[in-house]
A protein has these predicted regions:
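Histidine/acidic-residue-rich, glycine-tolerant segments that coordinate divalent metal ions
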Residues: 1-83, 165-166
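Short, hydrophobic beta-strand segments
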Residues: 23-27, 86-94, 124-128
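Divalent metal-coordination and catalytic microenvironments
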Residues: 31, 45, 90, 143, ...
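Structural signal for hydrophobic packing residues in well-ordered secondary-structure cores
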Residues: 49-60, 111-119, 147-151, 175
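Flexible, glycine/charged-enriched surface loops at secondary-structure junctions
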Residues: 57-67, 114-125, 153-161
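A conserved active-site cap/scaffold subdomain adjacent to cofactor or substrate pockets
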Residues: 79-104
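Short amphipathic alpha-helices in soluble, non-transmembrane regions
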Residues: 102-112
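An extended, acidic, His-containing surface patch that forms the Zn2+-binding/catalytic region
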Residues: 125-178
Length: 178
């Protein structure tokens, strides 16, 4: 929160770009008493999850504002049955388009490779794709100056980046936004 009598403003990038994705892994279900007759998509999903976590740790600069989250991992309906499918849903977020492009390319390499290694089929679906929210510096300055005319004691506080995303980004790509 900003101190009373101030306005929070960001000169350029405000909210991260984000891509939501879903990975569906298809194996061969069966009874837990005969795992050798099955192809376990949960096992594949665990390996996909671990491989994707390594992207942030080993392929993104330590100072980059980048996040990859698997927030949902669903499979099966009984404790003694190996399911036929497993589904992982997640998001990638970054303030750098090159980093985001790298993560997307690696997602598309890693998931099929891991799936093949564990004899499952993989499908990747993009659920959402939201660009970075970019504020227009000139418009920001105009707004601050206009507000200071109304309230001379107003202080402009520069905000830090927020890893959240917002579809307002599409508007800020078309017209100057603040």
């Amino acid at each position: 929160p900003a101190p009373t009598g101030s306005i929070i403003i960001n000169d350029t990038d405000t909210l991260a770009g984000s891509m939501g994705f879903e990975v569906t892994l298809e194996g061969q279900g069966g009874h837990g008493s005969r795992p050798e007759k099955c192809i376990d998509p949960i096992n594949t999903g665990v390996h996909v999850y671990l491989a994707l976590q390594e992207l942030i740790a080993r392929e993104c600069p330590a100072i980059s504002e980048t996040a990859l989250t698997i927030g949902q991992f669903c499979a099966g309906s009984a404790s003694n049955v190996i399911p036929e499918t497993a589904v992982l849903q997640g998001t990638m977020r970054s303030f750098d388009e090159k980093t985001m492009a790298h993560l997307i390319a690696r997602l598309n390499e890693i998931v099929p490779s891991v799936a093949e290694a564990y004899r499952t089929k993989a499908e990747i679906e993009v659920i959402s794709d939201v660009p970075i929210v970019r504020c227009n510096e000139e418009l920001n300055q105009e707004i601050v100056e206009g507000l200071k005319e109304l309230e001379p004691e107003l202080k402009a506080v520069c905000a830090y980046h927020v890893m959240g995303s917002e579809d307002f980004a599409y508007i800020s790509q078309k017209i100057p936004a603040s």
